[in-house]
Amino acid sequence: SLHDALPILRCDADSINFMKGALCYSDWLTTVSPSYACELQMPFFGEGLDGIFRRRSNILSGILNGIDQGIWNPATDSMIPANFSPKDMSNKAECKRALQEELGLAQDPTRPLVVSIGRLTNQKGLGLVRYAMDGLMARGVQVAVLGTGDADQEEAFSYFSNTYGNPMCARIAFDNALSHRMYAGGDLLLMPSEFE
């Protein structure tokens, strides 16, 4: 009964935490990565529940996020302009050229093209990317960002795209087909994270 569970759910004299109850009564606890499972056991990341995560660490596991190679395989992907593989990279350059053209970037095979695809949220560590943007642009790097999220992040990347023009493109949208072309055409994948 709820009355019996109150001592477990209670955070302090005036409040209860149903998440605490879920953590205490669950048969298994999973998170988005093994490192985040460790971080949750620390006061800074545990949000007051770190003690429970430590006590229940024997049933706490992180399932590493990853890419489905059956769907995101450049050797077989029908959403990209040309297929390639680690053993035959000859068509990779065509994917980059086509992406540069689509995004309005200079079609220059010698310029590094950094792509970032994902949620534009503070937890993703985009503050560091924003801080480094001037330096990237000064070095002749092309940057392409695709995603949606927090309004301040969306505005910042739209600002960079408008300010820097040609070497910077921000598409504030969810576009699965474009994400395939960006993974295939980019030279470097930027996937920052503040934590997890």
Label every PLM stretch briefly:
Residues S1, A5-E196:
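Catalytic cores of nucleotide-sugar-dependent glycosyltransferases that transfer UDP/GDP/TDP-activated
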